[in-house]
Amino acid sequence: MIEIRDISTKYRETFVLRHVSTRLPSDRMVAFIGSNGAGKSTMLNIISRLLEPTEGSVSIDGRELRKWDSRELAKTLTILGQTLHTPARLTVEELVRFGRFPHSRGRLENQDFLQIEKALELTEIVDLRHCYLDELSGGQRQMAYIAMAIAQDTKYIFLDEPLNNLDMHRAARIMKLLRSLVREQGKTICIVIHDINFVSFYADYVVAFRDGVLCHQGPTEDIIRTDVLRDIYGMDIAIEPYGDKKICVYYAVSYTHLT
């Protein structure tokens, strides 16, 4: 379990997160939602130890994050950020191999190669394995980075807008894949995401931010409601049933407030 206790963070003199406390459920897909600049990515960077909070603390599996050994932490959590730098003349397979570094320290063994192959297959990029990253489309590169994160094979996977640059087919494929990692392998996945309908269909739990404050949290069905979404996004969103799920219709809306 991930426990967040009274986290506040500021850049220069401006607070971007204020007194955030919550517990993120294990073995679930947790979606961080909210408008641009609400604090979602900052929170993800803090719980992955990429950013030190101004105040407060984070614990993973009962141990304070700052007390984790770096190598042990890299075997426990994976973070795929929003800004990805493409190394010159690196192939897809070479990139995915980096996901095994916390385990192999550069000396790949049979288990490492099996995980690499599995990640390439799950993301459907086996045929791109020998292609150089700078030869790929943005969507293909994104799939390669997701494969690298999967190859790391950690208990916790943190993804910051992983659907960037993906077409509808690949975006849906990735969300189904992440869902299967939770269901079949007991992974805990925290994902920053803007597409509220993917949240509705695939997330188990939602944490919503507005102006740096945690404004709503709970099971997905408790968040996908007109009144709650209005408070989060400042716009009226129609909600329609689709089987046992809900679809949010927000293409023609009226605004109540902008955050």
What annotation goes with each model-predicted range?
Residues 33-35:
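The feature captures the beta-strand-to-loop junction immediately N-terminal to the Walker
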Residues 48:
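Helix-to-loop junction immediately C-terminal to a conserved catalytic motif
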Residues 56-64, 73:
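Conserved ABC transporter NBD signature motif
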Residues 97, 110-128, 153, 158:
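Conserved ABC ATPase "signature" region
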Residues 132-136, 140:
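Conserved ABC ATPase signature
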Residues 256-259:
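Conserved small/polar residues in nucleotide/adenosyl-binding loops
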